[in-house]
């Protein structure tokens, strides 16, 4: 069902992937590419109610237990660059990426966070900076903290909010979380083996004595918070990208950003790459993508073409592999003007290619 629904957004032009070399020329000519995926994010953001109904969330999903511990996929830009399963996808496996500007990036990443994991992250970052700390939440799906547990509303493809605006998502999420307090709810541990369907063995009956949005939990701890609503495994919509560019421009020089999505792999890496792009204009995209992967993230220039790849994942990978280099080109060309030309306006020049 999910694969069929996603394919319905396919445009009628043919995709030609940009080469690894062409995508990494700072300020160079645009890759000679047919931009099949130019408007895919727009199509997701504007999906009709009928189309999006098949992704409707159907249960509360347990994601992080409330333990004082290092969260999954925790890393900073001061960490070691280590080969991993994702780096096996590198087209140039012997390439050593530049470290230029990397160690000076005040950013970190991880999975989502329980209340005590949020405390752990705050304490760790405070060892590294005396500046303001911002939690950068790049999840499109509704989530929050119940009794300190990190939970989310889960639907097919983890796209429970696809087609909704940023404002809708944030408002509905807060209402759902606050309505739980004092109630008894079922929270499920979901498994890939069960196709992420709720099972009796995975059910936990929970009396919600406390219920907070993530923003409320951050504010309570003196942390800044910013939300960019991006569907799982997807490239961001225009409004979310433009909001991020504007947000970064207004940050204090000594700010530290901690990015997270659900697992701390795809969307987290994507936004760490975006930040790296904006702060290190002289570094080729290839180096940025490789080093963010070797720090512990995903390799996001992978085009999904491996034999036997899941078709939905393959399409989403191909989208990112095409659109991330284009966004890199946007950053290169528009930094000198302070991004006066918005991303949505700039990319129109490629609509007829």
Locations of regions flagged by a protein language model:
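Bacterial N-terminal signal peptides
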Residues: 3-14
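Cys-dependent protein tyrosine phosphatase-like superfamily
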Residues: 18-258, 270-353
């Amino acid at each position: 069902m999910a694969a069929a629904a996603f394919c319905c957004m396919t445009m009628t032009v043919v995709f030609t992937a940009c080469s690894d070399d062409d995508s990494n020329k700072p300020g160079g000519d645009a890759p000679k590419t047919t931009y099949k995926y130019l408007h895919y994010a727009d199509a997701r953001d504007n999906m009709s109610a009928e189309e999006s109904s098949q992704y409707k969330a159907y249960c509360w999903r347990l994601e992080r237990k409330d333990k004082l511990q290092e969260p999954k996929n925790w890393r900073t830009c001061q960490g070691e660059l280590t080969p991993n399963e994702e780096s096996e996808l590198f087209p140039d496996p012997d390439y050593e990426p530049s470290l230029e500007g990397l160690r000076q990036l005040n950013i970190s990443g991880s999975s989502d966070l329980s209340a005590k994991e949020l405390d752990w992250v705050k304490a760790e970052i405070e060892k590294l900076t005396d500046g303001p700390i911002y939690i950068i939440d790049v999840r499109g799906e509704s989530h929050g903290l119940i009794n300190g547990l990190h939970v989310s509303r889960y639907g097919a493809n983890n796209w429970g909010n696809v087609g909704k605006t940023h404002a809708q998502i944030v408002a509905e999420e807060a209402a759902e979380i606050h309505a739980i307090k004092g109630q008894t709810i079922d929270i499920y541990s979901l498994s890939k083996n069960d196709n992420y369907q709720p099972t009796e063995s995975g059910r936990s009956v929970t009396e919600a004595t406390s219920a907070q949005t993530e923003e409320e939990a951050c504010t309570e701890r003196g942390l800044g918070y910013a939300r960019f609503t991006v569907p799982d495994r997807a490239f961001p919509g225009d409004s979310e990208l433009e909001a991020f560019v504007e947000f970064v421009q207004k940050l204090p020089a000594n700010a530290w950003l901690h990015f997270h999505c659900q697992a701390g792999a795809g969307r987290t890496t994507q936004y760490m790459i975006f930040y790296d792009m904006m702060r290190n204009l002289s570094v080729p995209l290839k180096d940025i993508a490789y080093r963010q992967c070797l720090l512990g993230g995903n390799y996001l220039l992978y085009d999904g073409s491996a034999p036997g790849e899941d078709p939905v994942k393959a399409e989403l990978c191909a989208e990112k592999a095409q659109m991330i280099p284009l966004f890199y080109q946007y950053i290169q060309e528009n930094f000198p003007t302070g991004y006066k030309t918005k991303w949505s306006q700039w990319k129109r020049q490629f609509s007829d290619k």
